[in-house]
Structures are given as C-alpha cells and as structure tokens.
C-alpha cells in the first residue's frame, strides 16, 4: 500500500490530489522495487510466477528500464544514483543484446529517454567508459528491425538521445527519419494513428504514437516537427478527455491495459509542450482521477508493487509478452512531474471532467467509434465499429466497451451467427450525432451490418445478418455484469423474448 498526504479539497475538489500526492506515489513505487534489484543493480527481478515469452533475463532488464523511466520523471538524484550503478554493469554484458524484434529494443527506448531527460543528473556524471558501453549497447537499436507498429518509434527515441550525445550521429539520424516516415502511413487523421497496418485503435495511440513523436520533437527543439505532431496531439486530447469515467476509470479497451495510468501520459504531454485544448485544471483532474481510481482500487499490492492486472492481480489483462515488470510502463503516467511546481497544471483549481458535466454522445469518425456518457453514474461507453485485431482479442472485437465493465470470454456485446462470434474485416459505415454503423464478416459468405442509436443511457442496436442459411440461430448479447451498475437487454424486434436479461 502507498501512504499519501491528506486530501487537498481546496485546490482539488474532485480528486483531492496535488503534486505532493504524485511525488509520494512515485517515491513509494520506486522504493518498493529496490529490494528486487540484483547486487549490481543492472536487473530488477520482480516477484511473480510468470515469465514473459522473452525470458527471465529480458524481464529483469524490463524491470530496470521501466522503473528508471519513473526515476527520470521524479528527478531524485539519490535514486538516479542507484540506476547509475546499474549502467556501470548492465551494458557491459549483463543485459541481453538488442536484436531484431526483441523485447530489449522496447526497453532501450525507455533507457534512452530517461538518459535524455536527466542528462545533467545522470549521463553527464558517468565516467567515459560507462558512457561508451551504454552508447554501444543502445546503438544496436538503430539498425534492429522493429515490429511494424509503435515499435518503429523505439529506434527514433534511441536515435534522438545518441545524436544529442554525439554517438553514431549519422546512423542515429537515419533511424529517426526512417521511423518517423514509417508511422505517417498509419496516421488516419483527427489525432488518430492505427498501431500498424489495419484498424488497430487503442491506447497505444496516446502512450506511444503521440508520446514518442511529440517528446522527440520537443527535446530536439525542432519547431517544425513539434508543430506537426503537436497539432495531432491537441486534436487527440479533445477526444481522449472523454475516455475517463466519473470515478477516474479509463475505458477498458485494447491490449496492455495492465499499464493502467499510463493512459494519462498524453494529458501531461499536452500541458508540457503547450499543445492541448484542455484547461490546466481539467488536465490534472483527469490524470489525478485515474491515479486515484487505481490506488484506491487496490492496483498496488501489500508490497507496494504493481502486479499484472487492473485493480489488483487479474490474468485476463495479461498478454504473452507480459512479464512481472511490464506494469511499470505505468511510469509514463508520471510525465507530469517534469512540469515545475509553479506550472498552472499544478496550481490551477481542478475542473470537472467531461463525464461529470452532462450526458453526452460524441462521434469519433477516424476510428469509427461513438462515445456515450451519462452524468448520473459517470459511466462512459465506447461503441466500437471500427477497431479490430487479428488475434481475436476480446479487448478489440466486442461491439462496445465501458469504464465500468471488462469483456468476458463468454462473448458479451457480440452477435453470434450459428454459434460463431467472429468479427473481422470491419467496414465502417459512418458515425454522427447519436448513431454509428458498420459491417463485419462472421466467416466466409456471412456478414452482419450493425447500427446503434443512443440517447442518455439508452442504446438501440439493430443487426442485419446476410449470407446465413435460413433457420441459422442468431444470438445477440449485451453488457457483462459490472460492479455497481445494471444493464437490461430488451428485444425490440426479430429476437425471442426469452433472450431478455440483465
């Protein structure tokens, strides 16, 4: 558990959190992982029975890199000194090499970003031999082949640091140009990137695609790049602010949700770089609301660690690439600590979040989503008619998601044709004020066209099945059970009344 200062309801009437609460949370998380460092401090082997597909050594590097990033945002010289000891050993043969599509490429980006952010406090204080070994280890990221998704930005992030540090500058600039050019293919407008080819929309849009591009431009003092990426970030934040429930909970959609309050990184990024449409008080209310939701909900265990899960351990939130230290990607949520105490994001009085102001329906044409929120219960619902994932992940293929429920293996929010819940080749048919539509393939020759109309807390869903043999059973499911919320499924036409339920 984490001990925090008393609530400050004068400046933060909605969450009670101030900068002091964020500092205390960061300090507690950093202190809790320290006992799990190896004697040379190059690896952090966090407890848990799970080993990721990359192996224990890579998982230990992940523990070092992701908590180093938290230390970089906190900028505590004593803590950074401990990570300096790890740099003396890690790149000299302890850490696994950076290879094509290997997990160390991911962690190299965190190491490089942390070193760039804290250069006077950490990098500049290392001796020449340690700097040389670290730069040589990082340099493999410049030519390692990434997966064709947000991974393209890891060589960019490493390249930005190495170019600034004067190491392999030409190769670094080539890696930067290559990665930034690659992601242009995935920008679909209105502040939205797909995470690779296809229609993969999720939180990686904010905590990866926007985060790495905008930070690179900002740290490089490249006005032209920052203007381009900053405009995109600002446009995204106008939508992103609506992804949080009245209780601070982020929408549960997409993979890697065990990163928890990393969802707040783009909020802080907008304030840090001046590219945000949100008032300072609203930015802090959204970010602090998310942090409080997780801390109050039990996301930190009795050892002070972040386990794999959501509000506490939960294997349904785990991917095969997840290791014991994976949740510490949540460190990105502490980006706001780079803003000085006197910045308006810390001094302004909290303002109400969108979900708490009024009932709202908000179309997002780029991903073909529709957001529906109700002030009375603070629940936000996302009607998904544009994002899919070839891995049949329930966090992508459902018709709807919310801030109060998690998808179930039993196919909630689905249309099952002949028992088949397939939902691929989603074709967006548009979205507007209060409606959204799409067509998807169940299996070869069978499609479902879906239209949803919403108002207040009510949803009307209509589905047209084409290509199925006469008499094929069709089952339509609604919301899964959620704590403190109630949903009713009432058939209006074409469905048996026996299917009505709660």
Locations of the language-model features?
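Hydrophobic side chains in beta-strands
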Residues: 69, 372-374, 465
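Aromatic-lined, polymer-binding surfaces characteristic
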Residues: 60-61, 69-74, 80-268
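Extended repeat-based interaction scaffolds and adjacent low-complexity, acidic/S/T/P-biased segments
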Residues: 391-502
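Solvent-exposed loop and beta-edge segments used for protein-protein assembly and interaction
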Residues: 61, 105-107, 364, 453-457
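Carbohydrate-active enzyme catalytic cores, enriched for enzymes
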Residues: 93-96, 245-385
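Residue-level detector of short, conserved catalytic/binding motifs and their immediate flanks
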Residues: 65, 370, 461
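Generic alpha-helical structural element
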Residues: 18, 56, 100, 148, ...
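Extreme N-terminal leader/anchor segments
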Residues: 1-92
